[in-house]
């Protein structure tokens, strides 16, 4: 126990010092009216990407951000002239702001300071992408460790506490191997499967945390497991030090976990549990939608992806974390007609907005361009 306490003290000192070096920067409460220059978008809606000076070229760049930039560079929206641009993107990677990550970029503030001040313009009309915020132990979502100015933030795991509605954009979290482009009009699922062909009512297979933020719900789900039509299995095996923190249930849970195949559960479950992890969002959300399973989201305060344009009430079930143990009763009382509607909507949402990195990137722009069009249309009628 003393060794564990020492470990926590070292971690606190280490990451506490990181916070002292990067004090929280209060974000301006922006709106499209006070932090966006619509005049830059009056004639065209072009996207400009700030170049990387040689001294920043060795900064790590994640596979995901490389693909996002590649798509915009090759799109009809791209311009290499900042005077033509409506939207501006940073050339440096801001997607991973966890200081422990190999993709964390330390010198983002230096990069921003190197930009032409008249083009950066305190972040106005800029769009910043972020998928991971904060780090152990609290995964703070209020500070990206650089000054975002008046920029819009397109981010995963958006919280009601930090998300500026009709200004920021809520993103899905996806793996780097998420399809870059898909030429087919439909996602690769057996769309002919009907709900009564799926043998499990609801399932979840994933890691649980025996301590810290995000541990609450995942430590509860074993109470729902019956090994028949409700499968809820978790493992403590994650990170190299998991045995230091294992509890009395870990070995039993690990053994049960190994009995079930993740993909088989996704393919054969009507509903799939999507509990929060350390952060609010999870890869499981897109994986669930892609498999044709209806997501049951348990993540208080999470702003679901693209909620500005997607009615998630028609494609997912959202349950408060405090009500997690009532999920079987809720799902069993859902009519077959309602289940069919949910699955069809979930399938359509995935195909229309989420099936590739290109589609996701384009929809971010589409949301912003729609705001611009609404503003211009409103002014024309005044």
Curated annotation (Swiss-Prot):
GO CC annotation, single: protein-containing complex
Signal in keyword set: yes
Major place of residence: endoplasmic reticulum
Gene Ontology molecular function, alphabetical: enzyme binding; glycosyltransferase activity
Stretch forming the signal peptide: 1-20
Subcellular location: Endoplasmic reticulum; Golgi apparatus
Disruption of the gene: reported phenotype: RNAi-mediated knockdown results in the failure of hermaphrodite-specific neurons to migrate to their correct position associated with a defect in axonal guidance.
GO biological process terms held by the UniProt record: heparan sulfate proteoglycan biosynthetic process; nematode pharynx development; protein glycosylation
Keyword Cell wall biogenesis/degradation: no
Glycosites: 268
InterPro entries for this protein: Exostosin, Exostosin_GT47
Keyword vocabulary terms for this entry: Endoplasmic reticulum, Glycoprotein, Golgi apparatus, Signal
Role according to the record: Required for the biosynthesis of heparan sulfate by positively regulating N-acetylglucosamine transferase II (GlcNAcT-II) and glucuronyl transferase II (GlcAT-II) activities of glycosyltransferase rib-2. Probably not directly involved in chondroitin sulfate biosynthesis but negatively regulates chondroitin sulfate levels. Maternally required for normal ventral epidermal enclosure and for embryo elongation during the early stages of embryonic development.
Subunit structure: Interacts with rib-2.
Similarity field: Belongs to the glycosyltransferase 47 family.
Miscellaneous note of the record: Does not display any N-acetylglucosamine transferase II (GlcNAcT-II) and glucuronyl transferase II (GlcAT-II) activities when expressed alone in vitro.
Protein name: Exostosin-1 homolog
Organism this protein belongs to: Caenorhabditis elegans
Lineage: Eukaryota, Metazoa, Ecdysozoa, Nematoda, Chromadorea
């Amino acid at each position: 126990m003393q060794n564990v306490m020492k470990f926590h003290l070292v971690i606190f000192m280490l990451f506490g010092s990181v916070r002292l070096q990067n004090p929280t920067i209060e974000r301006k409460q922006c709106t499209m009216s006070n932090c966006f220059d619509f005049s830059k978008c009056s004639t065209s809606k072009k996207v400009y990407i700030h170049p990387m000076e040689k001294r920043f070229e060795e900064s790590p760049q994640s596979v995901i951000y490389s693909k996002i930039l590649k798509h915009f560079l090759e799109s009809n929206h791209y311009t290499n002239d900042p005077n033509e641009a409506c939207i501006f993107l940073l050339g440096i990677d801001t997607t991973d702001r966890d200081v422990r990550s190999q993709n964390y970029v330390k010198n983002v503030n230096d990069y921003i300071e190197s930009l032409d001040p008249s083009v950066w313009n305190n972040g106005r009309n800029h769009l910043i992408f972020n998928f991971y915020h904060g780090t152990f132990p609290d995964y703070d979502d209020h500070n990206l460790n650089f000054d975002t100015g008046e920029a819009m933030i397109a981010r995963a795991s958006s919280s009601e506490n930090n998300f500026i509605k009709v200004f920021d954009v809520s993103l899905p979290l996806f793996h780097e191997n998420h399809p870059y482009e898909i030429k087919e009009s439909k996602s690769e699922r057996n769309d002919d499967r009907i709900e009564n062909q799926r043998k499990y009512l609801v399932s979840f297979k994933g890691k649980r945390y025996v301590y810290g933020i995000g541990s609450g719900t995942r430590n509860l789900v074993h109470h729902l497991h019956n090994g028949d039509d409700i499968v809820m299995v978790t493992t403590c095996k994650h990170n190299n030090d998991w045995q230091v923190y294992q509890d009395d249930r870990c070995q039993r849970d690990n053994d049960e976990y190994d009995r079930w195949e993740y993909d088989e559960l996704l393919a054969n479950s009507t509903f799939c549990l999507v509990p929060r992890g350390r952060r609010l969002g999870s890869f499981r959300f897109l994986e669930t939608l892609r498999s044709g399973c209806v997501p049951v989201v348990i993540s208080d305060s999470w702003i679901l992806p693209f909620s500005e344009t997607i009615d998630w009430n028609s494609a997912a079930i959202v349950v408060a974390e405090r009500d997690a143990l009532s999920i079987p009763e809720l799902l069993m009382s859902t009519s077959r007609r309602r289940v069919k509607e949910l699955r069809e909507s979930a399938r359509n949402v995935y195909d229309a907005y989420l099936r590739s990195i290109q589609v996701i990137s384009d929809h971010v722009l589409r949301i912003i361009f729609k705001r611009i069009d609404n503003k211009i249309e409103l002014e024309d009628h005044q």
